[in-house]
Amino acid sequence: MKIESVTALVVNARQRNWVFVKMVTDQPGLIGWGEATIEWNTRAVVGAVEDAADFLVGEDPRRTEHLWQVLYRQRFFRGGAVVMSAISGIDQALHDIKAKDLGVPLYQLLGGLVRDRVRLYDHLGGGDTDAVYNDAAADRFAERAREIVGRGFTALKILAVPRTGMLDGVYGVRQAVGLMSAVREAVGDDVEVMVDLHGRTTPAMAIQYGHALAPLRPWFLEEPCPPGNVAALAEVARALPIPIATGERLVTRYEFREVLEQRACAVIQPDACHCGGISELKRIAAMAEPYFVSVAPHNPVGPIGTMAAIHFALSTPNFLIQEVMSADVPWRAEVVDQPLEIYQGHVLPPTRPGLGVEVDERAAARYAQGPEPKLRYFHPDGAVADW
């Protein structure tokens, strides 16, 4: 079996563009799909997929590990979010082909089932965070939280923290507590609520937020400070009684290594579309296991990336919970046939071979790449603010 072509297919998804990787083999009808979506870098990642294709055409797609090593090691410059997103989508497509060729769901090649269902959580913002978060209204937060729980979810995540300066006053902390209080009152104590700080805060501010939110029992506090300083993250983790989660902007096991060694979090959140694909996601999870760190994969992307994460979750012992986007664009199901059987906030194991997805390329063409919104956020004094 040989790879004949590797191409990128771009679909507009409003807040971002989905970047799908299509891998065609010389076997009639045997096509692999993956996802390399990375926010606000669409043209860059498409180019990275095209560059990688030169290393793949003519190769046997069943040599998944060998081809991962070729793409990672034989181009001298390693890592980086754009290149690793391209490798991630390609790696997913390789696994899809291999499992389809054998006629089994992908999780069977990843060690088989270690659980019979995968717990999911929804994000309060769905696929359009600005629509929910810009006015930061407590009643809107409560209404949206009740709607999510009404659909059977037993866990949800909120972004309750405003864009924060280096050392702000009490306004932001009061706002976060007010919003979290409204959500907790709306859903009760039996629903887990995670709070995302989105890397907006310094360690000093993150500690203030954490202590203020602790009585409301967040399940975990996500990305309390930007990536790049693991010692600062570890400082936050030691100072708070709330488990810390991080990792959505980290790629490869090499960037997760220091986080684990410094005991900087209780939950890691690698993204199957960024970190290096399914191959690297499994390695990162295995690294985390002896540190008693669980894995809650980051997943605000498209339906193919979601299926990759589901197969990972079904086959990984230290998996915790899976993020899904339930309300990004109404044409999601039109573009990708994604066989998710969801019951009471859980998804059951898919039964189709491979990842289990089918892409309607004609539908995808109707929703081709669109302009992504420009993230231009500033503090009142005009200084740049983090998204």
What are the residue ranges of the model-derived segments?
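Shared catalytic-loop signature of beta/alpha-barrel
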Residues: M23, G47, A52, H66, ...
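Glycine-rich, aromatic-flanked loop segments that form ligand/cofactor-binding clefts
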Residues: D91-V132
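Metal- or metallocofactor-binding catalytic centers and their adjacent structured scaffolds
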Residues: D26-L102
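Conserved, mostly hydrophobic/aromatic
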Residues: I3, G29, A52, I90, ...
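Structured beta-strand/loop patches that form or line metal/cofactor-binding pockets in enzymes
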Residues: M1-W33, T37, A44, D328-V335, ...
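Extended hydrophobic packing segments that form well-structured cores
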Residues: L355-W387
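Metal-dependent enolase-superfamily TIM-barrel catalytic cores that perform enediolate-based chemistry
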Residues: R117-A239
